[in-house]
């Protein structure tokens, strides 16, 4: 954990900054990014945080129907300006926007209207077809994740979007088969974990290509195995992992979940139990 990284503005769904959006923000932070979630409904009510019952759905759709997209872009720009003044935000790599649902449409508009954006990613944005003429202004990378069965984006509309944007080499559109709107919302009724994981991987891949962070994974692995098998230093081995790691040695189903359990496993059952004359012989490597 270096305490800083490329800056991302995260744009909410129509349900405000709720537990789902905080979880999304944490995922991006774990990938090495400094991210801020924009409160898009602050002009109506500060800190709106809705769930997914019938009453909250109705309130969310009312907020959406009264939402001004132009003002939303102003809010994104203001959040980008705030990011640029944070010491945790890397200043020399450029800024990005990631959005879901309403935020997915705004991510598209931000790519069209904010020239400083290096990368924008939109998940199942609603209404992009109404602003396709603005695509000619996109200067950075744009990635769109689209649900094949999105009830808010019929097949004909989706095809129109993809056909129009296919003319731009810096735009990449992905279709996820047999899933509906909000397929990447954890715990939601349309959540589809395989599609969500693939979309997340594609999002992070696009971000890393455009703004980083660029990790030398091979060097990190070499350091990890050196501490684990050569110097046999448990604390140093643990330092090469994330804060709460998970290791499962498949043949014996041993290992640990979390720092405390895994550290205990290494200290008492693994690192110091390997033969002193053991050597490492690389066979293959996939990064």
Protein language model annotation of sequence segments:
Residues 1-90, 185:
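Serine-hydrolase catalytic machinery in alpha/beta-hydrolase-like enzymes
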Residues 13, 100-104:
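Short, thiol/selenol-centered motifs that function as redox-active sites or metal-ligating centers
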Residues 40-44, 126, 179:
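Short beta-to-alpha linker loops that shape the active-site pocket of alpha/beta-hydrolase fold enzymes
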Residues 76-80, 158, 200, 204:
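Generic structural signal for well-ordered alpha-helices
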Residues 87-101:
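Alpha/beta-hydrolase fold nucleophile elbow
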Residues 104, 143-149, 155, 174, ...:
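C-terminal and inter-domain tail/linker signature
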Residues 104-115, 120:
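Short glycine-enriched nucleophile-adjacent loop
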Residues 119, 125-177:
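The feature captures the conserved acid-bearing segment of alpha/beta-hydrolase catalytic domains
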């Amino acid at each position: 954990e270096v305490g800083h990284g490329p800056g991302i503005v995260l744009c909410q769904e129509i349900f405000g900054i709720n537990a789902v959006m905080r979880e999304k923000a944490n995922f991006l932070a774990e990938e090495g990014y400094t991210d801020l979630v924009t409160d898009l409904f602050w002009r109506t009510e500060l800190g709106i945080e809705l769930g997914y019952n019938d009453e909250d759905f109705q309130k969310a759709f009312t907020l959406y129907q009264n939402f001004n997209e132009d003002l939303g872009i102003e809010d994104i720009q203001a959040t980008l300006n705030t990011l640029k003044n944070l010491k945790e935000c890397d200043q020399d790599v450029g800024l990005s926007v990631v959005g879901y649902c309403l935020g997915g449409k705004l991510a598209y508009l931000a790519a069209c209207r904010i020239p400083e954006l290096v990368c924008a990613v939109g998940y199942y944005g609603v209404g992009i077809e109404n602003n396709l003429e603005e695509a000619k202004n996109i200067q950075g990378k744009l990635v769109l994740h689209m649900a094949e069965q999105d009830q808010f984006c019929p097949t004909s509309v989706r095809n129109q979007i993809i056909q129009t944007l296919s003319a731009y080499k810096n735009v990449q559109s992905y279709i996820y088969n047999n899933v509906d709107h909000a397929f990447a919302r954890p715990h939601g009724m349309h959540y589809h974990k395989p599609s969500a994981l693939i979309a997340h991987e594609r999002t992070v891949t696009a971000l890393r290509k455009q703004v980083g962070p660029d990790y030398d994974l091979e060097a990190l692995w070499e350091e990890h195995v050196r501490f684990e098998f050569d110097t046999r230093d448990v604390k140093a081995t643990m330092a090469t992992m994330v804060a709460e790691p998970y290791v499962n040695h498949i043949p014996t189903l041993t290992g640990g979940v979390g720092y405390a359990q895994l550290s205990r496993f290494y200290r008492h059952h693994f690192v110091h139990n390997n033969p002193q004359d053991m050597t490492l012989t690389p066979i293959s490597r996939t990064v």
